[in-house]
Structure formats: structure tokens, C-alpha cells
Amino acid sequence: SHTHLSGTGHSDLGDILIMPQTGKLQLNPGTAKDPDSGYRSRYSHETEKASVGYYEVTLADNNVRAQFTTTPRVGVHKYTFHGIYNYDGKVLWSTLRVENDTLLTGYRITNGWSRANYTYFAISLSKPIKTYGYRDMKQLKYRGFWRKFDIYNNFPEIAGQGVVTYFNFDNTDRKPITVKVALSAVSTEGALKNLK
């Protein structure tokens, strides 16, 4: 994830988590004792490479090579497909909008080390999204009208307390997917400017 506090001794930011997966869709993190129960992955320190401003590792369970670097305003991810922290009550609200097949925007409001901490984001993808869907893991009871459309599959925007999103890509060319993540503490527009 893109934001962390160093040495706080308690829960930190952990905002805008991206976890590449292949195979069965996993929307929960799982446990350290049973990594197969969720999306977390095993890895070996032997596959790690690190230097100032750069880190890479192979996520063993899905055989995904994950590479990370940064610019002054953007975190850059690169995932090559071969083949978390989860504090309940931390997220007050989050929203994600699919602007087009390679651009995502949104924000998340968290509670913890500060009250109502806003993190806005813009995410650029090097490959177009084929299909996508959402799950709200903490659906709020709503006594309003019954929706006659499916908001959980290929719908452009969702909001909630426990929003989890997945994206499917056509990876027949086996080329890596580069993900650029820009953040702003001010606005989505600020995150979009930082992305450029």
C-alpha cells in the first residue's frame, strides 16, 4: 500500500492497497497461518531486490513478479504475470470510479491515527480493463428503492465502507501490466495532476 507511518507502534495508514492475483478471485486477505484462505501471497527473501527508490519481489503463490519505483508524486507498480493489514473499522468510506478502461479515480476516508483522513487517488493502467466488478464487504442497510440494474459488475462507480474491486485483463500477449498510482491529500483533481 502507498502510505505508512514509521515507528508509530499502532495501526498506520495502509491506504490504496493493490494486490495482483491470478486464478480464483480472493477478496479477503486470509490469515498468516493459512495464506491460501485469502489474497495474501508467500514470498522468499531470495527473490527480493531492493535499492533506494526501487523494490521488487516474486509473489510465489501466483508467480507474479512485482516491481515498484517512485517519482516525486507517483508510485509506479509493474506486475508481470507468469502463468495486508486489515483493521476492522478503519475505513469510514471509500469510493472508486472507472473513468475509462485505463484510468481509475477515487478516495478513501480512514480513521485511526487521525480523524477523517482523506486520501484521494488516480490510477493509470498500461493495459485496458476487460471486465471488472465490486463487492461491498460491509453493505449498509438501505430501505430505498430496489435497483433494477447490476451495480456490482461493470458499473462505473461504487462507494461504501468495505469496497473491494477486481479487474480482468486480456493477458494473451503476456506483457507486464504497469500501474501508476498518484495520491493527493486535497482532491481527486490533485491526484490526476500528480499522475501527469
Question: What does each of the following model-derived ranges do?
Answer:
Residues 1-196:
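Accessory carbohydrate-recognition regions in carbohydrate-active enzymes
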